[in-house]
Amino acid sequence: MIIKSSNYAVSAVREDQYPKDNLPEIALSGRSNVGKSSLINTLLNRKNLARTSSQPGKTQTLNFYLINDEFYLVDVPGYGYARVSQKKRQEFGEMIQDYLETRPNLKGLVILIDSRHEPTKDDIAMYNYAQYLNLPILVVCTKIDKIKKSQVNKVMSRLKKNIDLNYDYVTVLTFSSVTKLHVAELGNWIEEKISK
């Protein structure tokens, strides 16, 4: 996928704030601080389009980025952030659920999982939920550059132990924003989904 243009479009917390142009969308989800903003910036070859932060819980809205005037990448608030109040977490959950369940132009979900850790209960719940919605899923194991090469197979077997990867619409990639590992494959997956 060749990126010709990429721009922040809009932030939304409810349906009437979503873009109205019916372009296809790919959503990105994962726990707080898993590297969603870094992945967006790396994929789009932009330094600060999506704001990165060492503070988890920064993204609190659905952030829509218009790519090539053809589709949107949608940055979903990170889940599992302990310092957000129970009420706020519930609001995030409802906002994400409304978006995933009601958005007809949603063509796929990228679930980011930190390759240094076991998938969390929230990661597994999001994966199962996307399966339930029959969404094409790309599981991206982020920060793979922080893992020794000899340990990469261990990361994959740990993932398979925790998540049922025998789903027809799932693809798994390792990824690094530092070394740019599998950036092209990520772009190809997105391109394939938005063209269907």
Swiss-Prot record:
The keyword GTP-binding applies. One of its GO terms (molecular function) is metal ion binding. It comes from the Bacteria. Residues 22-196 form the EngB-type G domain. GO terms for cellular component: cytosol. Belongs to the TRAFAC class TrmE-Era-EngA-EngB-Septin-like GTPase superfamily. EngB GTPase family. This is Probable GTP-binding protein EngB. It comes from Lactobacillus helveticus (strain DPC 4571). The gene is engB.
